[in-house]
Amino acid sequence: MHFTPALKPGKLLKRYKRFLADVQLEDGSEITVHCPNTGSMRNCLFPGETLWFSTSSNTKRKYAHTWELMTTPTGALIGIHSGNANALVEEALNKGIITELTGYDSLRREVKYGDENSRIDILLECAQKTACYIEVKSCTLQENGQGYFPDAVSLRGQKHLRELMHMASLGHRAVLLFVVQHTDIMSVAPAAHIDPEYANLLKKSVLSGVEVLAYRCEISPSEIHLAQSCPVRV
């Protein structure tokens, strides 16, 4: 995924009201940007450090700028835009980067499924294979090189695990795919210290036949894309 037009830098001042952040530009002026991340953004907020934002040509938007990347004090880059995760996975699937998920003929997004009124992020289908239901999660919480999910108690995430277990029980292929949008994360684990119920459900999911994958992103101010798999420590 290329950032077009090019991202612009600024210094993070503060995030507030979940969806807004104040940014200082290189000329000293300040703007407010949209924050496209509904999570806690734990360990992703570094006031005074450089962030990168995109600019929309849509004049009807209240906030023309969108926060895309955050630079950490160690120089790592974090993909803040959690909404990019599904598009990154679709791009990687089309290029054959996710080797565990090749050989399907069709890809559909946001398809209704399960018994808890859910929509699957990506559904892969092929006449010669069982359908593959993929739930995508963006992982940005990093502690000592270890990535964790979720970064706050996630009832929605728990529901998605139950739905995946249900699909696996029906004989379908069910996959949980972590998109690692933090260049300092080398492996992913459930955040049992934050959401123990999610961690328990994840272990149960694996025993029930749900596959768990994680792919690290290569990130720069010019582009972001899935690059290589990394371990998941359930």
UniProtKB/Swiss-Prot annotation:
InterPro entries assigned to the protein according to its UniProt record, in alphabetical order: SfsA, SfsA_C, SfsA_N
Short name of any one Pfam family annotated for the protein: SfsA_N
GO molecular function, one term: DNA binding
NCBIfam families found in the cross-reference section: sfsA (TIGR00230)
Family classification: Belongs to the SfsA family.
HAMAP family assigned: SfsA (MF_00095)
Official protein name in the record: Sugar fermentation stimulation protein homolog
